[in-house]
């Protein structure tokens, strides 16, 4: 039987802080396929997330198909706005939400993994990171600072992670990021430079696939997922309207589930996808294929 088999693999999923988003669903799918999973979580949300896990508040979401319970090998602090500890402003490093976490940068996360597991330490890296501080603003009203912040965290951080984790990933490793159709089409309401960030993310994926493939033999892909009513997506402000629009116009009118994206990510990280790199895979019930409204 042909199956996704990730036994013996270790994955890092960056950008998980609750049980409602794509990152959590991907982490769960990877565990279901046999991988061990470490998480990178935004420092201000880390304590709350660990408390939810420890107190059993999200136990229903942790249930696995085989009757077991989802467990993470490690949960590390990560703020993908910073490439190295030197990039973290002093006032941020000394703030209440950061001061007890040490080096929260991408390089700091890489160092923690090496300290815990040696080199090489991972097989799979998932980038489920995005932040647009001005996402509710139209592009015409977006500041330079807000625009660059969106691109830095949502797109450049993928290049930074591939650069830093590429040497720490076993040959034939897989990198996967998450994008959205606003990279290709105009989506009113998805502002603050986030559409530009997603376009950059998809463009970078193609070049990273070439560079990481030639340098280390790794594959680099991105999933363009449909809208999901996650806690993170609520920041957009029009997410429910976007979901309703997709259900009305997509070839498959059912609402997209996070688990469907998780399954595709697990496939892309597996040997079954060994010939796929530099690709943008749409998981959106076919909405991306449409050029007009339904006839009836």
Describe each region flagged by the PLM.
Residues 3-47:
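Canonical Rossmann dinucleotide-binding motif of NAD(H)/NADP(H)-dependent dehydrogenases/reductases
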Residues 15-24, 42, 130-215, 224-230, ...:
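Catalytic loop of short-chain dehydrogenase/reductase
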Residues 50, 54, 192, 215, ...:
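A glycine/serine/threonine-rich, flexible loop-to-helix segment
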Residues 51-150, 167, 183, 189-190, ...:
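Conserved mid-core segment of classical short-chain dehydrogenase/reductases
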